[in-house]
Amino acid sequence: MMRIKLFKYKANKFDMELDKIHYDEVAKLQANLSDEELKVQVATNGIQKFQKVVFDYYYECIGKNINSKMDVLELGAGMGRHSGVILDTGANLTVNDISASSLEVLKRTYPDIKNMVVSSMDQVPIEAKSYDVIVSCGSLSYADPNILDREIFRLLRNGGSLIILDSLNHNPIYKLNRVFKYFIKRRSKSSVKRIPDLDRIDRLSKYFNKSDIKFFGTYFWMITILGFFIGQDLANKTNILLEKYFPSSKNAFKFVLVCNEFNGHQE
């Protein structure tokens, strides 16, 4: 039996409650919108153009790795911005979030989703080995890394897959932006500290026979500035070319990780 050894990290339940309160408040504001208004706030609608390439690739990975015969869990689904892409595969989708208010908004947008679980991502009240694929978009930092990784491995069936889009924590410019969000109370201190790093990616990947990672956003920080001089459309095209021909993990902002053929076992 393979043993999973995870790094030490002290959880902060108070911060988790702060995050829940924040997203409950955001969801309650969204709940005032009409159904038509909610339905246009999905996928990449409203996302900055230079970031769309990341989400387009994430959606492509979902389409390639999920089919209608699979049971899929989306961790930290929030109000369902990206849930529709999974639903379109025909898979049996379960969505999870700590904010009940967020899932209520999601239900209005996607009434066909029947399985909703209100809980922390690191304590999902579901039987072990229930899912063929686990998906997460931008939510890894909202739970203790030790417990969350164990929970992912507990819930995933042998041979299963993991698809993650998230941010990286080693670019100083992006770090500064997250610290600013902490001071204006848009993020908790723990969620800033727990942004994934390359070591976290390695720990998640090692229990799968196959894994593939693609980095994005090395040049995001300069695109807005560049847009003032050459126009935003040309700046976006420049970003796409730079990402294509000069990809780099060193200063990347985001990553998409796809792991297949889970072979690990929880202790």
Language-model regions: role of each:
Residues 1-66, 69-78, 163-186:
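Conserved class I S-adenosyl-L-methionine
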Residues 79-123:
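Class I SAM-dependent methyltransferase SAM/SAH-binding core
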Residues 135:
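A conserved beta-strand element that flanks and buttresses the S-adenosyl-L-methionine
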Residues 147-158:
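A short glycine-rich, Lys/Arg-flanked "PGG" loop and its adjoining helix->strand segment in the class I
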Residues 181, 214-267:
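A C-terminal cap/extension of S-adenosyl-L-methionine-dependent methyltransferases
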Residues 192-209, 213:
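Short alpha-helix
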